[in-house]
Amino acid sequence: MTLTVRVISPDKTVWDAEADEVILPSTTGQLGILSGHAPLLTALDTGVLRVRTSKSQNWQAIALLGGFAEVEEDEVTILVNGGERGDTINLEEARTAYSQAQTKLNQVPAGDRQAQIQANQAFKRARARFQAAGGLV
């Protein structure tokens, strides 16, 4: 049996296809979903969603910018603030953005809490895009 997986952002459907397995970036760690999984509602962190399709045993990567996932009767519905398929991300641009975000994060003054939070969020977004594009494992 397979899962029906939908990834929906405010402006587009990022993914809508059958899959054998899904790995979600939940706020408490990675969460694997197979057919027959118990019903579930979970918050998602900024990170990489991995989907193994029935047609190909390869994993597809999708960068997610946080959201929620619901699992119900072999249907996985993922509502995200933003999402981008790894195969549409330019690897070199993602590598540059990741490096720049890492540098900015390291340069934030220790006492500037708001700047630290913003730089950390930018770093997590850049890392997710770079990972989804195949730059980091």
UniProtKB/Swiss-Prot annotation:
The keyword Acyltransferase belongs to this UniProt entry's keyword annotation: no
GO molecular function: ATP binding; proton-transporting ATP synthase activity, rotational mechanism
Cellular compartments annotated: Cellular thylakoid membrane
InterPro entries per UniProt: ATP_synth_F1_dsu/esu, ATP_synth_F1_dsu/esu_N, ATP_synth_F1_esu_C, ATPsynth_dsu/esu_N
UniProt-listed Pfam families: ATP-synt_DE, ATP-synt_DE_N
Main subcellular location of this protein, as a coarse class: membrane
Gene Ontology annotations for the cellular component aspect, listed alphabetically: plasma membrane-derived thylakoid membrane; proton-transporting ATP synthase complex
Keyword entries, A-Z: ATP synthesis, CF(1), Hydrogen ion transport, Ion transport, Membrane, Thylakoid, Transport
Membrane topology per record: Peripheral membrane protein
Gene3D superfamilies per UniProt: F0F1 ATP synthase delta/epsilon subunit, N-terminal, Helix hairpin bin
Family classification: Belongs to the ATPase epsilon chain family.
Its job: Produces ATP from ADP in the presence of a proton gradient across the membrane.
Subunit organization: F-type ATPases have 2 components, CF(1) - the catalytic core - and CF(0) - the membrane proton channel. CF(1) has five subunits: alpha(3), beta(3), gamma(1), delta(1), epsilon(1). CF(0) has three main subunits: a, b and c.
Protein name from the UniProt record: ATP synthase epsilon chain
UniProt source species: Trichormus variabilis (strain ATCC 29413 / PCC 7937) (Anabaena variabilis)
Species classification: Bacteria, Bacillati, Cyanobacteriota, Cyanophyceae, Nostocales
Gene name of this polypeptide: atpC
